[in-house]
Design a protein with these regions (language model features):
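N-terminal Rossmann NAD(P)H-binding glycine-rich loop of SDR-like oxidoreductase domains
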Residues: 17-37
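Conserved Rossmann-fold NAD(P)-dependent oxidoreductase catalytic core, especially the SDR/UDP-sugar
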Residues: 106-149
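Substrate-positioning beta->alpha
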Residues: 181-187, 201-224, 230-234
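Conserved C-terminal active-site "lid" loop/helix of NAD(P)H-dependent oxidoreductases
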Residues: 212, 248, 271-302, 307-308, ...
Length: 316
């Protein structure tokens, strides 16, 4: 375990936060935005790379073997654990998800517990609570029913955190959008950029999304709140959108009309199946709506309205 940059001097009274996953989609954004809010960041890296801009210091170490993390967590006030295997990395065996998303998280949490870290923020997923679609509105009170290896690994990590003495919080993130996004959201951006009218005006299923900036607000809020948390919290933009509304917002950002038309859903499914695309788009036919009311009770105020955020995304 070795530092690649000197420790920040203790003269600053601002919180020192250890961040994992700083090279990922969400981690990079947190690394850029949290220092603007006064946080000092210590980035935990698995291998020696260029020191990311915006961090107070960096430490090299393997999160799957955190027995020697005492130095890395020295003087740390809080941890944001963003590292892990993403849902977009399909085709991996369940053992890989369990190793990197569950076991590494719990071992790291135990190291944080020994280091007397005050708060452990785990970036979980709404998929820890349900499959790609769900009946009704998801709340933290509903029994979790993940349907794939990714979701099961995230839920198991949450359960492992609950067995520690840490003041932890698991942020169950809805589908996140922002610069550099991959996976399903990248597919929707590609659809919106296509020059063709789209036969999705009749799809009424609604989908909860989450702007990166609203996620930063949530992380800031749970780092600052004084009362113990020790629970999962759903993080989603307040108003879900239909697929048509998502595409319309993106095309508005491109300065174009929505260009959507109606095709009966069974016919649309048949056409996608014939083209070999039905599996990739099947989740779009069902709703996944998540309620962030519990987080709002902690005075979380999302800054980005979803339609405006989607319009801005495609302009970048």
């Amino acid at each position: 375990m070795s530092h690649t940059a000197p420790k920040a001097q203790k003269q600053s009274l601002k919180p020192l936060v250890a961040l994992t996953g700083a090279t990922g989609f969400i981690g990079q954004y947190l690394l850029r935005e949290l220092p603007k809010r006064g946080y000092r960041l210590r980035v935990l890296l698995r291998r020696p790379t260029m020191l990311p801009e915006g961090c107070a210091s960096a430490v090299i170490g393997d999160l799957a073997k955190p027995y020697n993390m005492a130095e890395a967590l020295s003087d740390v006030d809080a941890v944001i654990h963003s590292a892990g295997i993403a849902s977009t990395m399909s085709g991996l065996p369940e053992d890989d998800y369990r190793l990197f998303n569950t076991e590494a998280t719990v071992k790291f949490a135990r190291a944080a517990e020994r280091a007397r870290v005050k708060r452990f923020v785990f970036l979980s997923s709404i998929r820890a609570q349900s499959g790609p679609t769900a009946d009704g509105v998801l709340t933290e009170e509903r029994e979790p029913r993940p349907t794939d290896a990714y979701g099961r690994s995230k839920l198991a990590a949450e359960q492992g955190l609950a067995d520690t003495r840490l003041d932890w919080v698991a942020l169950r993130l809805a589908l996140v959008y922002g610069p550099g996004v991959e996976g399903n959201m990248a597919r929707l951006i590609k659809l919106a950029r296509s020059p063709y009218p789209l036969p999705i005006a009749g799809l009424k299923a609604e989908h909860s999304l989450l702007a990166l900036d609203n996620l930063v607000e949530a992380v800031d809020k749970v780092l600052a709140v004084q009362q113990p948390l020790k629970r999962p919290l759903i993080v989603a933009d307040p108003k879900p959108l239909t697929l048509g509304a998502i595409i319309a917002a993106m095309r508005q950002g491109l300065g174009r009309r929505a260009a959507l038309f109606y095709v009966p859903k069974p016919l649309l499914k048949s056409a996608l199946r014939a083209a070999g695309h039905v599996d990739g788009y099947e989740p779009l036919f069902g709703s996944l709506v998540a309620d962030p009311s519990a987080l709002a009770k902690l005075n979380w105020v999302p800054r980005v309205e979803t339609r405006a955020g989607l319009a801005a995304l495609v302009r970048k």
